[in-house]
A protein has these predicted regions:
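N-terminal membrane-anchoring alpha-helices
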Residues: 1-22
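Catalytic core of membrane glycerolipid acyltransferases/transacylases, capturing the structured
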Residues: 5, 18, 33-89
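Short, basic, glycine/proline-bearing loop/turn elements
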Residues: 12-13, 79-85, 113-118
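A short, well-structured juxtamembrane/interface segment
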Residues: 15-35
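Residue-level preference for the first positions of well-ordered beta-strands
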Residues: 36-38, 107-111, 142
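Hydrophobic/aromatic ligand-binding patch that stacks against planar heteroaromatic rings
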Residues: 52, 76, 100, 132-134
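Helix-adjacent hinge/juxtasegments
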Residues: 80-109
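A cross-family acyltransferase "interaction/gating" segment
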Residues: 118-170
Length: 170
C-alpha cells in the first residue's frame, strides 16, 4: 500500500499539532523503527489520530469508520492508507486488510474503544479486535494513553507510549 500522501502531509500535521496543542510526549522511543506493530490508543477526540501521526515516525494505517472516507476528506484519508470499517454490520474486509498491512511489517493504529464520547470521562469498553489482530499476525501491541484535553494554544495534552508486548497464548 503506497501512502505517498502520508509522507507529504505528515510534516504539516506535525507542525500544526505541536504549534496548536503544545503536547508533552513520553516514551516515544518505545515504538520500534521497524517490524509489525499495533498501536492501540484510548480514544478521546478526533485529534487522537493527529496526535499519533505527529508524535510517531512510523506510517500508521488506522482502522476508521467507513463514513470518514465518504466525506470531503475521504480521498486524503484513502491516500494515507486508512482501512475502512463498516460498523453497521459485521465487517469481513477490515481484519484481512489490516492483517495484510501487518504481514508487510507495517503499523496498524486502532482505538479499541471503537469510538469516543465527549460526555464520558474514562474509558469505554474495549473491543477484542486489537488483541485478535496481534494474536493472528504475531504482532506486538504498543499501548498508548492520550491524557488531557485538546485545547488550542495551551499545554494540557500528554501522549504516553507504553512498552510493546506480545499476545502469547490463545
Amino acid at each position: 500500500m503506497d501512502v505517498w500522501f502520508y509522507r507529504f502531509i505528515r510534516p504539516i500535521i506535525k507542525a500544526f499539532f505541536y504549534i496548536v496543542f503544545r503536547p508533552t510526549v513520553k516514551y516515544k522511543e518505545n515504538v520500534p523503527k521497524k517490524g509489525r506493530i499495533i498501536i492501540a490508543s484510548n480514544h478521546t477526540d478526533y485529534f487522537d489520530c493527529v496526535a499519533l501521526v505527529a508524535t510517531n515516525k512510523r506510517t500508521i494505517h488506522f482502522l476508521a469508520k467507513d463514513e470518514l472516507l465518504k466525506g470531503v476528506l475521504g480521498p486524503g484519508f484513502k491516500a494515507m492508507g486508512i482501512i475502512p470499517v463498516n460498523r453497521r454490520e459485521k465487517d469481513k474486509n477490515a481484519l484481512p486488510a489490516a492483517l495484510k498491512v501487518l504481514e508487510e511489517d507495517k503499523v496498524i493504529g486502532i482505538f479499541p474503544e471503537g469510538t469516543f464520547k465527549k460526555d464520558i470521562d474514562g474509558l469505554l469498553p474495549f473491543k477484542i479486535g486489537a488483541v485478535k489482530m496481534a494474536h493472528d499476525s504475531k504482532s506486538r501491541i504498543i499501548p498508548v494513553a492520550v491524557v488531557g484535553k485538546f485545547r488550542p494554544f495551551r499545554k494540557g495534552i500528554t501522549i504516553v507510549y507504553g512498552k510493546p508486548y506480545k499476545i502469547e497464548s490463545d
